[in-house]
């Protein structure tokens, strides 16, 4: 507190050994991957929810391989929309406050929810926190053990560990996809297409350009190596909702850091705060 007197003799001193122990990442038990696969096999409507931890652990390619192996839908967190391409047959949108209606219907209809590298904050699960995936058995994988203990999202199977390790372990296991899941995948595809952010009638409106139409047209012109940085407010939210990501594209909001690269970068913002230079 500002102006308070501090007695330094009562402060806890830094202990590098304690710091090292807290930073150690536990190994995921060998029986966990099979337990997850058993849950997937028995579920009627399994759904993977992928967050920023997938990118931070250099696991994007592993995630795509796993989805292809399991043949089940994958949704993405609001700030991880560039993990999975829009035209991927298993893409299930982004069920969040910044997401789309179809994807929200999907997460509410799944009976197994596997979250990978997402801390499931309020911006994701929204304010009716107990209703997010309310019909689902929840498996949560996070490198931060404290995230598994939050009262806002309570997993039935919390897994403290590196999502990269878990994905590698899952890929090594034998698994035959459940043929019944094909109907669920097609239903998810239908929901994504039925409830787009940019409705057909927006293209025929007379008057100022609809921002969703702009986003739609912009992504139609972008290629697989383009990088898009976004400002706050509508520039961020409406783009997250309407983005039709091609695999390899990057999309940032200015709550993170967008480093320069040798590829073309685009910036979309409004009158508010601008992204980092």
Region locations from a protein language model:
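Active-site diphosphate/adenylate-binding microenvironment
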Residues: 189-262, 270-272
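Conformationally flexible catalytic loops at phosphate/diphosphate-handling active centers
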Residues: 1-42, 193-199
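Glycine-rich, acidic loop regions that bind phosphate or pyrophosphate groups
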Residues: 1, 24, 80-190
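A short, small-residue-rich loop immediately preceding and capping a beta-strand
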Residues: 49-52, 105-118, 253, 268-277
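A short helix->loop->beta-strand "cap" motif at the edges of active sites that frequently abuts
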Residues: 71-72, 133-137, 249
């Amino acid at each position: 507190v500002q102006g308070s007197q501090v007695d330094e003799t009562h402060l806890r001193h830094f202990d590098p050994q304690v710091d090292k122990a807290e930073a150690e990442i536990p190994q995921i038990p060998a029986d966990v991957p099979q337990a997850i696969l058993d849950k997937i096999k028995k579920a009627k409507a399994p759904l993977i929810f992928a967050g920023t931890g997938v990118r931070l652990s250099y696991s994007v390619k592993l995630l795509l391989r796993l989805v292809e192996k399991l043949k089940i839908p994958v949704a993405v967190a609001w700030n991880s929309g560039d993990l999975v391409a829009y035209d991927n047959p298993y893409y299930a949108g982004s069920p969040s406050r910044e997401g789309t209606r179809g994807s929200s219907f999907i997460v509410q209809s799944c009976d197994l929810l596997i979250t990978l590298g997402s801390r499931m904050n309020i911006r994701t699960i929204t304010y009716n926190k107990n209703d997010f995936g309310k019909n689902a058995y929840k498996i949560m994988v996070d490198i931060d053990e404290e995230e598994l203990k939050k009262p806002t999202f309570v997993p039935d199977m919390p897994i403290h560990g590196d999502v990269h390790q878990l994905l590698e372990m899952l890929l090594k296991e034998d698994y035959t996809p459940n043929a019944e899941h094909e109907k669920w995948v097609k239903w998810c595809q239908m929901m994504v297409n039925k409830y787009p952010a940019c409705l057909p009638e927006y293209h025929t409106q007379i008057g100022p350009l609809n921002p969703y139409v702009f986003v739609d047209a912009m992504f139609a012109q972008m290629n697989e190596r383009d990088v898009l940085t976004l400002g706050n407010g509508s520039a961020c939210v409406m783009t997250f909702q309407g983005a039709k990501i091609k695999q390899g594209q990057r999309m940032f909001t200015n709550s993170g850091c967008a480093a320069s690269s040798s590829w073309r970068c685009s910036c979309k913002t409004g009158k508010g705060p601008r992204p980092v230079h």
